From Swiss-Prot:
Record EC number: 4.2.3.106, 4.2.3.46
Top-rank taxon: Eukaryota
Cofactor, free-text remark: Binds 2 Mg(2+) ions per subunit.
Annotated gene: ILTPS2
UniProt lineage: Eukaryota, Fungi, Dikarya, Basidiomycota, Pucciniomycotina
Reactions mediated catalytically: (2E)-geranyl diphosphate = (E)-beta-ocimene + diphosphate; (2E,6E)-farnesyl diphosphate = (3E,6E)-alpha-farnesene + diphosphate; (2E,6E,10E)-geranylgeranyl diphosphate = (E,E,E)-alpha-springene + diphosphate
Protein name: IDS-like terpene synthase 2
């Protein structure tokens, strides 16, 4: 008897989804090998709950939302940047292919998205419209920021520092704001403090810190040597260097080439360090941002857990990063 003799009987079987299928489908995601609970967005979320006092079960669900979304973004970022390494290992799409990795990243995002409904019992009202709006708005902001970053890269348009800050306010800031907004929406505290100036500063601080660390020997082990040059990316130090001397096209020419060889990238790095002092400038900006974050934290009455995180992400002096 053919399965087509009574096709309707086949639907339940066709719709079944086994644990083995799920495990295989998630392999590009698990390949990342990251503990989402120890990633910065999750750590920051737990620290900010000091002010919002959301019950642990609800906090756990929020972490189950932000962690996978952040990981999915890393999978997509690696594809869009044509990266080779993450955490010292081959990136997922080099192992499983671009198509499977995109599909898995999308699936992980939707799976996290569906967890919003689990927050309903903790909501201040039976309606969860605000919760859906939060995730919709911040995911949209993330994609807008990512788009303009890619647009600058692919069009070889160097933004101003102000434009770059607005971009990372969306792209990086969204992954920090999303869980904090969920905490705010679910908080049993009558009048929780306004933490968003601090959240936004932390997002900007983290991205510019990553931009500087991408030039360090330690980061080379994780992502390769000065990969921003190979990716043609306008990072914060590169933007400063290009704008510092618009008559010198060295960096633009190197970004256009997207070099893989170390000598070319070392030449660009030395120019940024010695000629335009862009690493010094970036370090100075990070120090100002750290100071601002600590001042905001003090205004909010302090938070030992968040203070520890700020100490953890504090940048090293320039000589330890660039002299080699």
């Amino acid at each position: 008897m053919s399965i087509y003799d009574d096709i309707f009987k086949q639907f339940p079987t066709i719709d079944e989804w086994s644990e083995s299928n799920e495990k295989i489908m998630l392999e590009p995601y698990t390949h990342l090998g990251i503990n989402t609970a120890k990633e910065l967005p999750s750590m920051v979320t737990k620290a900010f709950n000091h002010w919002y006092q959301v019950p642990q079960p609800a906090l756990d669900i929020i972490l189950q939302i932000v962690g996978p979304i952040h990981a999915a973004c890393l999978l997509i970022d690696d594809i869009q940047d044509d990266s080779d390494l993450r955490g010292g290992n081959p990136v997922a799409h080099k192992v499983y292919g671009v198509a499977q990795t995109i599909n898995t990243a999308t699936y992980v995002c939707f799976d996290a998205y569906h967890k919003i409904s689990k927050l309903t019992p903790f909501s201040k009202s039976p309606e969860t419209t605000d919760l859906w709006s939060i995730i919709n708005d911040e995911i949209a902001a993330l994609h807008r920021g990512q788009w303009i970053d890619l647009y600058w890269r692919d069009s070889l348009i160097c933004p101003t520092e102000e434009e770059y800050l607005r971009m990372i306010h969306n792209k990086t800031g969204a992954i920090f704001r999303l869980p904090i907004k969920l905490l705010q929406a679910l908080s049993p505290v009558d009048s929780p403090p306004d933490c968003f100036p601090l959240v936004n500063v932390v997002g900007i601080l983290v991205q510019i810190r990553n931009d500087l660390l991408s030039l360090s020997p330690d980061f080379t082990k994780d992502k390769g040597f000065c990969e921003d040059f190979s990716e043609g990316k306008f990072s914060f130090p590169i933007i400063h260097s290009v704008k510092a001397d618009s008559s010198n096209s060295l960096l633009i020419d190197i970004l256009r080439l997207r070099p893989k060889d170390e000598p070319t990238k070392r030449k660009a790095l030395r120019y940024m360090k010695d000629q335009t002092k862009s690493l010094d400038h970036t370090f100075d900006v990070l120090c100002k941002l750290e100071k601002t974050a600590k001042e905001e934290l003090e205004k909010l009455g302090g938070n030992s857990e968040l203070s520890s995180i700020l100490e953890l992400i504090q940048v090293s002096p320039i000589p330890e990063i660039a002299d080699r």
